[in-house]
């Protein structure tokens, strides 16, 4: 095992966690370091000192030759200094509270480091920020190829696919609402909530009108019971996976309030979307559908600069439709 490390720390949704892990893995591979994942304090668990990775994913020893620490050894492991970014060289007690400005500063420092294709003298590089868009797609594919849901979760995914998807051309619809949280980059898509739902329904109709080799089945995955009611009222034959929702406008679905089952439900939907023939991403800024974006033959997105404009992305070409 290498004696220098990249530590990937996240407490957010699985899309962000895995995408950020891909960026950390690429740097670890390039600089001959061991990669460690620390998902303690995960939004999916009410146990702050439990590493969420082994709760939801199968144990692995390496990712394409990069040694990988992914269990609760991170609780006792003493990562060697010096550290990068420099913030982590402070006494541990002073690192407990990190203001948002510091997190964004570290994200930018890591971005510069990754883009420069250089290494640093630090023995441990700490990646504790959202690192979406900070690596190439092949790094993302490597993570999704290597990191597998636990066997019992995969069995649930397979069973649902066989019962509801097999023999159909599946259209997966992901609608990230936020349910009252600060949705940040997603906000422009929800400036007019009624229009947003109308746009989603328009996209579903557009997807159904495209050529399909088999009978079409539409599945909706959303974090909002309100959105579920609105969309299913217009498409009565819509398929949904039973799960618990939080009260209206009470915050994001990825919450410790729902326990481990909430995380399992999220993984089931994320991987089922990746098995669809067509996926609609609303908004396309959500990392939850990144796996589907990389694996599904046809993706329908909403233009970042003009959310009313649909973009149809095929594996070999890109077309637009208004």
UniProtKB/Swiss-Prot annotation:
Keyword presence, Nucleotidyltransferase: no
Residues covered by the GT23 domain: 1-314
InterPro entries xref list: GT23_dom, NodZ
Gene3D superfamilies the UniProt entry points to: 3.40.50.11340, 3.40.50.11350
Signal peptide: none
EC numbers, comma separated: 2.4.1.-
GO MF annotation list: hexosyltransferase activity
Biological role stated in the UniProt entry: Fucosyltransferase which adds the fucose moiety of the nod factor on its terminal reducing N-acetylglucosamine end. Uses GDP-fucose as the donor group.
Family: Belongs to the glycosyltransferase 23 family.
Name listed for the protein in its UniProt record: Nodulation protein Z
Biological source species: Sinorhizobium fredii (strain NBRC 101917 / NGR234)
Lineage of origin: Bacteria, Pseudomonadati, Pseudomonadota, Alphaproteobacteria, Hyphomicrobiales
Gene coding for it: nodZ
